Design a protein with these regions (language model features):
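Metal-dependent phosphohydrolase cores
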Residues: 1-192
């Protein structure tokens, strides 16, 4: 148990360093510092140690074993960079809400960092995009515009094989084109 505690602590701390580096490039300094601090809380830490494998998220392992995870319920309710945080109207099946720019961008930084932490030297931006494509967009409770933003960002990183699109000028542009609805202007003909 002590060995798994150390291994889990090392993995989440490594992940946190990668998130910080990605957030630094995205100019989300404070978010990089405070990212996922709840993972060190007893509620999240001890369950994650119990289900730690080193190759898969302990939360996913716990969900497979039990159908749910107390650590995940705790985590997603305290960290707005998770799309699950942005679901409301549960009495009617749940309505995914559009994630604000900074939360959506931190989520992208988080996804990349998870790949970097788990895949280590085998990590590529292409493998991360392949992971993203394996998610069925019709089955995840993510707002369609947030989904488009994440898809554009991860696809761009995959093509360019770097994370330069995290820089604010590009990331804000991709967010804008993902979330702005086209304006249809109706022009009335002049009566003669």
């Amino acid at each position: 148990m002590l060995k798994k505690s150390f291994q889990h602590f090392k993995l989440i701390s490594t992940h946190k360093v990668y998130v910080f580096k990605n957030c630094f490039k995205a100019r989300l300094f404070w978010r990089g510092i405070k990212h996922d601090l709840s993972k060190y809380s007893p509620t999240e830490f001890f369950e994650s140690v119990k289900y730690f494998t080193g190759t898969d998220s302990p939360i996913n392992v716990c969900k497979k074993a039990n159908g749910w995870s107390k650590a995940w319920m705790h985590h997603k309710g305290r960290n707005s960079h998770h799309y699950e945080y942005w679901v409301d109207n549960f009495d009617n099946g749940g309505t995914p809400l559009l994630m604000p720019y900074k939360d959506a961008l931190e989520m992208v930084c988080d996804y990349i960092a998870a790949g970097q932490a788990y895949q280590k030297k085998e990590f590529t931006y292409a493998s991360e995009y392949k992971w993203w494509q394996s998610k069925d967009k019709n089955k995840i409770a993510m707002h369609p515009d947030t989904y488009k933003f994440v898809d554009i960002m991860l696809k761009t990183m995959s093509v360019e094989e770097n994370n330069d699109c995290l820089r604010p000028i590009r990331a804000k542009h991709y967010y804008k084109i993902s979330t702005v609805k086209p304006v249809i202007k109706v022009v009335k003909k002049k009566e003669e």
